[in-house]
Each structure stands twice: as C-alpha cells, then as structure tokens.
Amino acid sequence: MAVVDLKARPRAGRGKGYRNRLKQNGLIPAVIYGKEVGSLLLEVETRAVQDILTKTGRNALIQLRVEPEKGRAKKYDAIIKDVHMHPYKNEFFHVDFHQISLKDELTTSVNLKLTGSAPGVTAGGRLEQLIRQVEVSCLPRNIPDHIEVDVSGLGIGDAIHVSDLKAPEGVKFETDGDVTVVTLIAPHREEEKAPEETGEAAPAPTPETGQ
C-alpha cells in the first residue's frame, strides 16, 4: 500500500469559536497519539482528509508532516484511527491519527467485498451478509484495501465462514474462523390461510325465565 502525504500544523486554540474559525478556513481539529509522539493536537485540511478516505480508505498509510510556525517540520507514520462526523450531515468534526512503525505488525479492520453471482439467488434465495469487516494483523504496508468474498458457488442453504476466505500474503485473520460472513437463505413462504369454518352457528342460549 502506498504512503499518502498529509500536512498538519499544531493546534492554535480550542473551544467552539476556534472550531468555527477552522471550519471557515477549510480546516478541522485532529490529534495524533502513539508511543513516540505521546499526544499532539493538530489541525488539518478537511479536503485532504476527504480525499484520503475517498481514494484510499481508512487504512491508508499516512506520512503526517507537522509544520510548526517555527522550527523544522516533523514526520510521523500514521493511520486514521477514528473520524468524528455530524450525525446527519456530511461534515467532519475531528480526526484521530494513530502513530505506527512500518516495521511492526498492527491489527486493524478491513472491509469485505462480495464478488460473483450466487446460483441460489437465481433460484429465489436471498443473500444475507452478516459481517462487513474482518480483523487482520500484518505489517502496515501489507494492509489490503479489502478482502474479496466469492459467492459464485453458493446455493440455497450454503454459507461462507471466515475460515473459507483467502488471506493475502503476509496477512493473518484475527476474526474467529467459525464466524459466518454470508449465507444464502431460502425464500420466505407465505403463511397458509386458516381454513374458513363451515356449518351453521350454534343457536344462542335461551335466557332463563322465572316461574
């Protein structure tokens, strides 16, 4: 996986007013944390983060270049750990970066991508995907963009488990092998209607009369 360059600078304030000023200038607050850097508050370009997420994804390897107002810039190898967004607007609030070493293995989540056409779907079945990511461990440069799940051999009642997936070279699955990834279930049958009752209704009881 290629390394993406991203410029950042130390954060110069805090609070709602500061965040609003960042937004007006096309910036968002961020933080990078790790063994060497500790915790460093930053601000980065919103569009640059959007481009990384759109073109490369959350597992992009990032060389974060922190440029202070004075002194030399410092570079940190990192991945995006979390993205905080508005609950219903496509608007970034905050980005968390995690400093990594390119020489050390890490554990991360990788998206699953279904490929092929399942014969069971043609027969009327329904394909149900139970998980959309798997945990993997590998060197940062070996993080795959996605893991393919070929469903072209699935008939009704069949399933694919994590143990059935093929891991790329240098990648190990950490998700339990017994976990079901996708299953092909039979179509739902319409419930049979209860047969209508036939015959004459029993006569209503005659009320008692006094003697």
Curated annotation (Swiss-Prot):
This is one of the proteins that binds to the 5S RNA in the ribosome where it forms part of the central protuberance. Gene3D superfamilies: Ribosomal protein L25, beta domain (2.170.120.20), Ribosomal Protein L25, Chain P (2.40.240.10). SUPFAM superfamilies: Ribosomal protein L25-like. One of its GO terms (biological process) is translation. It comes from Desulforudis audaxviator (strain MP104C). This is Large ribosomal subunit protein bL25. InterPro entries: Rbsml_bL25/Gln-tRNA_synth_N (IPR020056), Ribosomal_bL25/Gln-tRNA_synth (IPR011035), Ribosomal_bL25_b-dom (IPR020057), Ribosomal_bL25_C (IPR037121), Ribosomal_bL25_long (IPR001021), Ribosomal_L25_dom (IPR029751), Ribosomal_uL5_bac-type (IPR020930). It holds the Pfam family Ribosomal_L25p. Belongs to the bacterial ribosomal protein bL25 family. CTC subfamily. The gene is rplY. Residues 200-211 have a biased composition (Low complexity). Keywords: Ribonucleoprotein, Ribosomal protein, RNA-binding, rRNA-binding. One of its GO terms (cellular component) is cytosolic large ribosomal subunit. One of its GO terms (molecular function) is structural constituent of ribosome. Residues 188-211 are annotated as: Disordered. Part of the 50S ribosomal subunit; part of the 5S rRNA/L5/L18/L25 subcomplex. Contacts the 5S rRNA. Binds to the 5S rRNA independently of L5 and L18.
